[in-house]
Amino acid sequence: MLRHSPQFSVYRIALTLFFMMLSLLYLFPIFCLLLGSLKPSSELLRVGLNLDIDPKVMSFDNYTFLFNGGSIYFKWFFNSLVLGLFTTVLTLFFSSMIGYGLAVYDFKGRNIIFVLVLIIMMVPLEVMMLPLFKLTVGLHLIDSYTGVILPFIVSPVAVFFFRQYALGLPRDLLDSARMDGCTEFGIFFRIMAPLMKPAFGAMIILQSLNSWNNFLWPLIVLRSKEMFTLPIGLSSLLSPYGNNYDMLISGSVFAILPVIIIFLFFQKYFISGLTVGGVKG
């Protein structure tokens, strides 16, 4: 058989080596980040790529300063965690119900709403920044976390994804639950939502990543330094009056940890959710 042929074995080995090299290429910036976080600013500002591993200049002083009780870093870190948690939960809650409704219920204007969702998906966020800002000012939500969260409690991408996934749910369960006297909300939360775990797992990863990395909108809305999120706080370390590259790099190391932890928890749902949800129609 082909799988036992020498040509196939060589192909598998070559393909494995290729992906190993590609993985190392992707991991190289992470290695540089970890290495740079252990060096002082004087070493980081050297000309050229500095990959020297010198125990004499490398230390954990950057992390010691970062963990100092007087450091505002953990305030930024906590702000990002809270905003990311609330934004992700609200986005999944509303987007899943909207997507489920568009897939299951037959009502007038359903297709028009779905087309509008597709159109909004194609509009860059930057195009909507000015009207969103004017609306936020009118609601007196500037320099508040509500102003940061409110525009993102419904995601057109998540609505589309949940709708596509819900199209594959068995309708017999709906009829059986209705015959047993279950309410529509009860059907969704008790029966259909558990069946949509892969979709929720995939969206938790994507929405958490979007919320954690959200930079432009919080930068526009937030004014107080104590309310900054982590991306804004780290960017504030770079200024015309001085650049704290050592703090920036060590802070960036911890900034990637929550995303890695979330992916490790929900990775088993990620591929299956994207695969199934992306092909239903």
UniProtKB/Swiss-Prot annotation:
The chain crosses the membrane at residues 15-35, 81-101, 112-132, 142-162, 185-205, 247-267. Residues 77-266 form the ABC transmembrane type-1 domain. Keywords: Cell membrane, Membrane, Sugar transport, Transmembrane, Transmembrane helix, Transport. It is a multi-pass membrane protein. It comes from the Bacteria. GO terms for cellular component: plasma membrane. Induction: Transcription is repressed by glucose and by the binding of AraR to the operon promoter. L-arabinose acts as an inducer by inhibiting the binding of AraR to the DNA, thus allowing expression of the gene. One of its GO terms (biological process) is transmembrane transport. CDD domains: TM_PBP2 (cd06261). Changing residue 180 to A: Negative impact in the growth rate in the presence of arabinotriose. Its main location: membrane. It is found in: Cell membrane. The complex is composed of two ATP-binding proteins (MsmX), two transmembrane proteins (AraP and AraQ) and a solute-binding protein (AraN). Part of the ABC transporter complex AraNPQ involved in the uptake of arabinooligosaccharides. Transports alpha-1,5-arabinooligosaccharides, at least up to four L-arabinosyl units. Responsible for the translocation of the substrate across the membrane. Belongs to the binding-protein-dependent transport system permease family. MalFG subfamily. This is Arabinooligosaccharides transport system permease protein AraQ. The gene is araQ.
